[in-house]
Each structure stands twice: as structure tokens, then as C-alpha cells.
Regions:
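Non-catalytic accessory/interaction domains
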Residues: 1-179
Length: 179
């Protein structure tokens, strides 16, 4: 999106920033991910960004950066895993392969930590819900004018659905590839 752009020097590792923003509107720090820093949003602000992702208001660089920051911050203990997972839900209509690939990597990282726990089955269902719509929109077969990134988007969605045990995907793959 477009909006007000401000710049300043952050002189410490933790420095609050006062924004003159409408409290009902979303804002994105580090637009296009040009800075080498992570942004840890307050829960209310992250919720507004989730809506912006779902509404298609953020470009691919910003969608990639948001989920990358959220995952890195939860891994480092600066934010909760539930914060990253809540943001992840907003990517169920993702259209760009690099964004989906990075998200899939983060989701797999969390799965590795909870595998065998009482939460694992619900987590698998949650992950399937993210990839299902993307796979349905991408289909199984290459389209005539499709580029390599669209093929990568499709393969990322389908392979993750297979990994997370989606029955429809497993049956289709079995029939398609005579397994």
C-alpha cells in the first residue's frame, strides 16, 4: 500500500516508536523489507495486518517479511507461537510461491517441536486448512501460460497437503501417479 513514510535512527536494541497512525488502521514497518531488522508488532496491530493480508492489501515482499519476522521472533522467544500461527492463518489465499514456501518451512519447524504431543493432530488439521484453498486454486496440472513460480506454488501447496495427510490429496496423487 501507500501511506506516510517516516525514517529515523533506532539507537538501541529495544526502542519504542510512537506512530501518528489512526488506531483503527493497519500500518507496516520496514516496507518492502529494505531494513535489516525484525519488527515485533503488538497483538492488536498484528491482527489488523492479518486482515490486510487476507484482503490483498500487502505486496509479496511485505507478506514474506511479516511471517518471517513473526516466525523468527517466536523461535527466539520474543513472541508467542500462537501469534505466528494466528498470522499464518491469514495466508490461506497466498498467491506467491516464495511467500508460501517460507511459511511452509516455519510451519514444519513448529511441527517438529510438537510432534508426538497432544496438540499434533489439531496442528495438522490447522496446517491443512492453510494449504487446502491454495491447492484447490492451483489445481494439479500446469496451465498453458503458467510460469515456474506458479508451478512452485502448486507443488508447495500439494506437497504440504500430502505431508499433513490430506485424504483427498493422497487419493488424487495415488490415482494420478499409479502408486
Amino acid at each position: 500500500g501507500t501511506g506516510n513514510i517516516s525514517s529515523g535512527l533506532i539507537e538501541s536494541s529495544k526502542e519504542p516508536i510512537n506512530l501518528n497512525a489512526d488506531s483503527n488502521e493497519w500500518f507496516k514497518l520496514n516496507p518492502d523489507q529494505t531494513g535489516f531488522y525484525r519488527v515485533n508488532y503488538q497483538p492488536n496491530d498484528l491482527s489488523k495486518l492479518e486482515e490486510a493480508i487476507q484482503d490483498g492489501d500487502l505486496n509479496g515482499k511485505d507478506r514474506l517479511g511479516l511471517q518471517g519476522d513473526a516466525y523468527a521472533l517466536c523461535r527466539a522467544g520474543y513472541s508467542s507461537v500462537s501469534s505466528f500461527l494466528s498470522l499464518s492463518r491469514a495466508y490461506s489465499k497466498e498467491t506467491e510461491a516464495p511467500v508460501l514456501s517460507e511459511l511452509a518451512s516455519g510451519l514444519r519447524g513448529i511441527e517438529n517441536l510438537i510432534e508426538g504431543s497432544e496438540f499434533h493432530n489439531r496442528y495438522i488439521e490447522f496446517c491443512r486448512s492453510i494449504f487446502k484453498n491454495i491447492a484447490e486454486n492451483s489445481g494439479w496440472d500446469k496451465k498453458e501460460s503458467e510460469g515456474h513460480l506458479q508451478a512452485l506454488l502448486r507443488s508447495t501447496a500439494l506437497s504440504n497437503l500430502g505431508h499433513y495427510g490430506d485424504e483427498d490429496t493422497l487419493h488424487q496423487a495415488s490415482a494420478k501417479f499409479s502408486l
